[in-house]
């Protein structure tokens, strides 16, 4: 029986069936079919984004994980900062009295940022000494003030500790006489995508770790990392706040010297091509000796570098907030020395108003008003540099050479016990220098110091020859075979020793600015101690950065 031919019904596409279907299960299935059949690119893109997100999440968690730290973490942390010390670059002696009025960035170093690259930041982070907040109540209180979430972190907070506990002093390896006025714990939170950028402030503080070279920067006692939270801690000595101290000692302070020390603090930063970018009277502190120090170095950066909106409202110059994009932080602005000069001029004006509000006459008020007007000029080209500010007639009675060395008077009164504290600090610095010198001597003692051929030095030459053969990959059997022939072995040994000695001398003489030794040679390249110290202090942050960049590449 033959069936009549019937035309096949037209095939419906998944999209048409989806439009007519009302069943949610069928709708979902048809949607998946459409995605699988008609959208292979969409499917692959979706899978790629999913895998990328999971991989990025894994990397961020691994980066933020706190690894265990070796016992000598505090020592390694100090050495890691000593390698790259941009701040250790001393200014020329002829500029000790008044700095030159060079243009901003005229002596710029070839750096994109003040802090190092990712690999070195990670190494510094791992070398931070870990601290458990639950064992020390001061850190527990400090950590409770900040919030560190996975995707975002809040602002840093400070905690004042007038009387540190015995457990805290023991943990910091301090005595009560070392911090007679108390300490400040600054908690710095960070998120999982921080990539170790939170080490910037501890890194910068360690650059200014020697108070004898940088007396106008607040010292740091310890830099720590939490074992249970995404928080870093800076432990600083408790100093007096500038506005409160001016309020208390308004009738006895030396106002001109106060402004001169504030200018000198900024000058020491600008001499090293650094800009603070958030100068205000609240970021200046008064030391126990009655002198000024600058604090809050988290905003420090290379001069003339571009950055998004940073600073305090009312202290920022017009060029950093002249447009909507700048004010909202959508566009970067250039921050340089004249940016700090504007902020410093606003701080001068606030302090002068504060003094007049307390019924105290401002000395040389007319000259100060002219100076502040120039410092706060809306046009950066008309704004003076910090060297020109210090040369203003308002500071005609100030010897900035003494101000730089802090050899003269102090604008505020000394606190009781300030002289004893200064003596203890000097003793601690000398002890640390001796320990560093002993460690360096121990390291140099491991380097072969042979200066003559093996036939004249005996045992020393033999040790050097063995090291040469070991470094060249020679096996013990080959050494035994070589020693069978005395004459030929002695000649080979002597030749190897001479080549090694020459290579060692060339390696010790490497580096810019090295000179040939004069006089008696020593273990550190045959240079007198004074010359070695100059070369060590002259090693800037640029050299360390170049090494780090080479490692990263």
Swiss-Prot record:
Its EC number is 2.7.11.1. Residues 1-64 form the signal peptide. ATP binds at residue 186. This is Serine/threonine-protein kinase WNG2. Residues 1-20, 88-107, 432-553 are annotated as: Disordered. Residues 125-395 form the Protein kinase domain. The active site is at residue 278. It comes from Toxoplasma gondii. The record marks 111-112 as: Cleavage. It is found in: Cytoplasmic granule; Secreted; Parasitophorous vacuole lumen. The gene is ROP34. Pfam families: Pkinase (PF00069). Disruption phenotype: In BALB/c mice infected with knockout tachyzoites (type I strain RH), virulence is not affected. The protein kinase domain has an atypical kinase fold which lacks the glycine-rich loop that is critical for ATP binding in canonical protein kinase domains. Its main location: cytoplasm. Residues 465-486, 494-524, 531-553 have a biased composition (Basic and acidic residues). Gene3D superfamilies: Transferase(Phosphotransferase) domain 1. GO terms for cellular component: extracellular region. It catalyses: L-seryl-[protein] + ATP = O-phospho-L-seryl-[protein] + ADP + H(+); L-threonyl-[protein] + ATP = O-phospho-L-threonyl-[protein] + ADP + H(+). Keywords: ATP-binding, Kinase, Magnesium, Metal-binding, Nucleotide-binding, Secreted, Signal, Transferase.
């Amino acid at each position: 029986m033959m069936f009549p031919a019937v035309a096949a019904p037209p095939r419906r596409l998944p999209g048409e069936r989806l439009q007519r279907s009302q069943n949610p299960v069928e709708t979902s299935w048809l949607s998946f079919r459409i995605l699988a059949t008609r959208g292979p690119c969409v499917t692959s893109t979706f899978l790629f984004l999913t895998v990328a997100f999971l991989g990025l999440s894994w990397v961020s968690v691994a980066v933020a994980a706190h690894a265990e730290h070796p016992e000598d973490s505090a020592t390694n942390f100090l050495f890691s900062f000593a390698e790259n010390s941009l701040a250790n670059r001393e200014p020329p002696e002829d500029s000790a009295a008044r700095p030159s009025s060079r243009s901003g960035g005229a002596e710029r170093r070839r750096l994109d940022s003040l802090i190092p690259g990712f690999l070195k930041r990670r190494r510094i982070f791992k070398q931070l000494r870990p601290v458990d907040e639950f064992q020390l109540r001061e850190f527990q209180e400090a950590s409770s003030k900040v919030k560190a979430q996975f995707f975002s972190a809040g602002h840093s907070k400070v905690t004042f500790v007038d009387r540190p506990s015995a457990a805290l002093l023991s943990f910091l390896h301090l005595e009560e006489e070392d911090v007679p006025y108390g300490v400040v714990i600054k908690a710095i939170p960070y998120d999982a995508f921080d990539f170790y950028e939170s080490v910037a402030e501890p890194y910068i503080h360690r650059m200014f770790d020697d108070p004898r070279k940088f007396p106008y920067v607040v010292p740091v006692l310890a830099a720590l990392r939490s074992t249970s939270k995404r928080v870093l801690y800076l432990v600083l000595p408790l100093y007096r706040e500038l506005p409160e101290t001016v309020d208390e000692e308004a009738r006895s302070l030396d106002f001109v010297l106060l402004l001169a020390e504030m200018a000198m603090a900024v000058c020491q930063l600008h001499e090293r091509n650094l800009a603070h970018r958030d100068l205000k009277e609240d970021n200046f502190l008064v030391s126990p000796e009655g002198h000024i120090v600058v604090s809050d170095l988290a905003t420090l950066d290379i001069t003339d570098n571009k950055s998004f909106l940073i600073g305090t409202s009312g202290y920022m110059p017009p060029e950093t907030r002249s447009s909507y994009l700048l004010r909202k932080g959508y566009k970067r602005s250039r921050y340089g020395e004249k940016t700090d000069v504007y902020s410093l001029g606003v701080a001068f004006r606030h302090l002068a108003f504060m003094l007049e509000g307390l019924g105290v006459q401002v000395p040389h008020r007319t000259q100060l008003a002219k100076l502040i007007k120039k410092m706060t000029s809306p046009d950066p080209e008309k704004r003076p540099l910090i060297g020109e500010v210090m040369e203003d007639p308002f500071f005609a009675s100030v010897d900035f050479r003494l101000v730089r060395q802090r050899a003269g008077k102090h604008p505020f009164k000394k606190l009781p016990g300030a002289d004893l504290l200064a003596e203890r600090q000097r003793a601690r610095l000398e002890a640390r220098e001796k320990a560093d010198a002993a460690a360096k001597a121990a390291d140099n003692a491991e380097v072969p110091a042979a200066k003559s051929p093996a036939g004249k030095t005996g045992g020393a030459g033999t040790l050097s020859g063995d090291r040469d053969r070991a470094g060249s990959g020679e096996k013990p059997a080959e050494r035994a075979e070589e020693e069978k022939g005395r004459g030929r072995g002695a000649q080979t040994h002597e030749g190897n020793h001479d080549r090694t000695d020459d290579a060692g001398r060339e390696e010790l003489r490497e580096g810019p600015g090295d000179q040939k030794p004069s006089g008696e040679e020593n273990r550190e390249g045959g240079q007198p101690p004074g010359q070695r110290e100059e070369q060590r202090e002259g090693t800037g942050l640029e050299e360390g950065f170049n090494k780090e960049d080479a490692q990263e590449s």
